[in-house]
């Protein structure tokens, strides 16, 4: 159950950050300002929801276990940006992502 909640925090946070990226990519103009504000508002809702779930998780899981698992957010954001915007992922970046996943697996086995 805790794994799922921590993963939910990562998903909400990832979605919020992707909404920020989408808002930042909007060009200037009156219609674009509404578009940007809408995506930023969605981002705030997602990140706020992530924070509330995260606080609930921290009440029940040692921070030494929970926080490293939250680093999966780096992996999710990178993969989503690659898929959505075709952002490049270098070999070194990919190796770093694999190390993050391996570290999370090593540290999260006690849950």
UniProtKB/Swiss-Prot annotation:
Subunit structure: Heterodimer of ArnE and ArnF.
Biological pathway: Bacterial outer membrane biogenesis; lipopolysaccharide biosynthesis
Keyword line: Cell inner membrane, Cell membrane, Lipid A biosynthesis, Lipid biosynthesis, Lipid metabolism, Lipopolysaccharide biosynthesis, Membrane, Transmembrane, Transmembrane helix, Transport
Domain of life the protein comes from: Bacteria
Subcellular location: Cell inner membrane
Gene3D superfamilies in alphabetical order: 1.10.3730.20
Predominant place of localization: membrane
Pfam families: EamA (PF00892)
Species annotation: Sodalis glossinidius (strain morsitans)
GO molecular function: carbohydrate derivative transmembrane transporter activity
Protein name as catalogued: Probable 4-amino-4-deoxy-L-arabinose-phosphoundecaprenol flippase subunit ArnE
Record-annotated membrane-spanning stretches: 39-59, 61-81, 89-109
Membrane-topology descriptor: Multi-pass membrane protein
Function, in words: Translocates 4-amino-4-deoxy-L-arabinose-phosphoundecaprenol (alpha-L-Ara4N-phosphoundecaprenol) from the cytoplasmic to the periplasmic side of the inner membrane.
Keyword Cell inner membrane: yes
Stored InterPro entries: EamA_dom, Flippase_ArnE, Small_drug/metabolite_transptr
One GO cellular component term: plasma membrane
Family per similarity comment: Belongs to the ArnE family.
Cited SUPFAM superfamilies: Multidrug resistance efflux transporter EmrE
Record flagged with keyword ATP-binding: no
Domain EamA: 40-109
């Amino acid at each position: 159950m805790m794994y799922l909640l921590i993963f939910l925090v990562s998903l909400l946070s990832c979605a919020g950050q992707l909404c920020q990226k989408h808002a930042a990519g909007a060009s200037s103009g009156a219609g674009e300002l509404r578009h940007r504000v809408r995506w930023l508002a969605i981002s705030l809702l997602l990140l706020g929801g992530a924070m509330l779930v995260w606080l609930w998780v921290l009440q029940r899981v040692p921070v030494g276990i929970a926080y490293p698992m939250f680093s999966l957010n780096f992996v999710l954001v990178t993969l989503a940006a690659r898929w959505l915007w075709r952002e490049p992922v270098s070999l070194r970046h990919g190796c770093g992502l694999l190390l993050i996943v391996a570290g999370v697996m090593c540290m999260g086995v006690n849950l």
